[in-house]
Amino acid sequence: TGFFWDERTFWHGGGNYAFTLPVGGLIQPMAAGGLPESPETKRRLVNLMQVTGLMGELDVRTASEAPTEALLRVHPQSYLDTFKKMSDNGGGELGLRVPFARGGYELAALSAGLSMAAVEAVLTGDVQNAYALSRPPGHHCLPDYPNGFCLMANIAIAIEAAKAKGLAGRVAVLDWDVHHGNGTEAIFYDRDDVLTISFHQEGNYPLDTGALADRGKGAGEGYNINLPLPAGAGHT
């Protein structure tokens, strides 16, 4: 089992924002650990894996930043240019609930790179299976509009990279999260080579996506499956 991670992705923070509000006046800055999408839970997982000895049973690896060529298969140049410019000039709020600090572009590209490396390692037979522990996350990010703390569409970038190398044909994405994977859904909504399946809490986030009736369109009709669950649903 390959375990792909990089401490630097845990340094991603909200910059000069408190949650999604600009700091100033009565708005006090908050640490990265105070964000709803916090690095501390991920760092805690790594620590537990180390002290229990589990880390020694894994093939631990890191990765490079996803190259621009890979990012452009999902995100338009205009989006990447805007993101990079803001990142180089101290960060800011790029979309809906996506504050980031200086260097956020490079950390998002590194997060995407970890996903790319994990997928490629499995498809080439280098490892049997893999897990990429990285942030910022990606399943809410649309090609030209980030939201929900997601700045780049990590899994879509990884899928397109694998396809470009001839490593993957038909792909299934299983998104298990309290939130609907609206970004991943939108990217592949009209395609029949990628099946997207999302388990999520009904009516959570985003409020207007994730309906059972949303099944794809055109060639992608039937290749998008939403399984919204009621709040409080258990394991049975």
Describe each model-derived feature in a short phrase.
Residues 1-236:
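HDAC/HDAC-like amidohydrolase catalytic core signature
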